[in-house]
């Protein structure tokens, strides 16, 4: 009697265990993979531009962009009258008051040295000086000077010009840029000759 009851108990317990195992959810075998970014082919995206369709007889004009061109400025060295100061007035005053005056013109830093004795005037002196300056090899090679070369020209404009009359001890000291144009930056002007009358203390110079 005891053995059949024990056997029945074991059978019922085994059936409960099997039922419990079947009811448990099985883990999913599908592995989750991280999302991958889209593969870029390395080619830039090209936006297609709409084409232009022309009807018979129609035309399209295309104008290319023009770049601003800089026209070179030609170097012109000419006599500057009147100069930056009253130099020309004093020279013409000395000519009118000192008989048979012979002028000596020197620019030591440029090795320029000449005399004007026949019909002297400030115009003649400055024109001759301008010709001597233009004959300097460095100046003569500058047809269309660059910005750096114009800076060098400006430095030359600061050298002293000695104009004097040895017989009477009269002298006048000017800058080269006072009597010769062409040393200005950035524009190189051309100044027309103009001599004014004698003024100021030139008679006593």
Swiss-Prot record:
Main localization (coarse): host cell
Compartment(s) where it occurs, according to its Swiss-Prot or TrEMBL record: Host nucleus
Protein name as annotated: Suppressor of silencing 2b
Function field: Acts as a suppressor of RNA-mediated gene silencing, also known as post-transcriptional gene silencing (PTGS), a mechanism of plant viral defense that limits the accumulation of viral RNAs. May directly interfere with the mobile silencing signal.
Swiss-Prot/TrEMBL keywords: Host nucleus, Host-virus interaction, Inhibition of host innate immune response by virus, Suppressor of RNA silencing, Viral immunoevasion
Disordered, as annotated region: 23-52
Example of a GO cellular component annotation carried by this entry: host cell nucleus
Source domain of life: Viruses
Family affiliation: Belongs to the cucumovirus/ilarvirus protein 2b family.
Upper lineage: Viruses, Riboviria, Orthornavirae, Kitrinoviricota, Alsuviricetes
GO biological process annotation, one example: symbiont-mediated suppression of host innate immune response
């Amino acid at each position: 009697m005891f053995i059949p009851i024990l056997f029945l108990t074991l059978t019922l317990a085994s059936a409960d265990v099997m039922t419990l195992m079947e009811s448990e959810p099985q883990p999913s075998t599908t592995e989750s993979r991280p999302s991958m970014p889209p593969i870029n082919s390395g080619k830039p995206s090209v936006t297609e531009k709409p084409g232009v369709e022309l009807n018979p007889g129609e035309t399209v004009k295309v104008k290319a962009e023009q770049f601003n061109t800089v026209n070179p400025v030609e170097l012109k060295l000419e006599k500057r009258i009147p100069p930056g100061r009253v130099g020309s007035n004093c020279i013409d005053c000395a000519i009118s008051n000192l008989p048979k005056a012979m002028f000596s013109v020197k620019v030591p830093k440029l090795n320029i040295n000449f005399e004007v004795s026949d019909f002297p005037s400030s115009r003649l002196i400055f024109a001759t000086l301008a010709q001597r300056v233009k004959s300097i090899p460095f100046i003569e090679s500058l047809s269309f000077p660059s910005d750096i070369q114009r800076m060098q020209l400006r430095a030359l404009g600061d050298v002293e010009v000695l104009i004097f009359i040895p017989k009477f001890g009269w002298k006048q000291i000017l800058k080269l840029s006072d009597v010769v144009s062409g040393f200005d930056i950035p524009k190189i002007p051309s100044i027309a000759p103009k001599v004014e009358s004698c003024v100021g203390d030139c008679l006593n110079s």
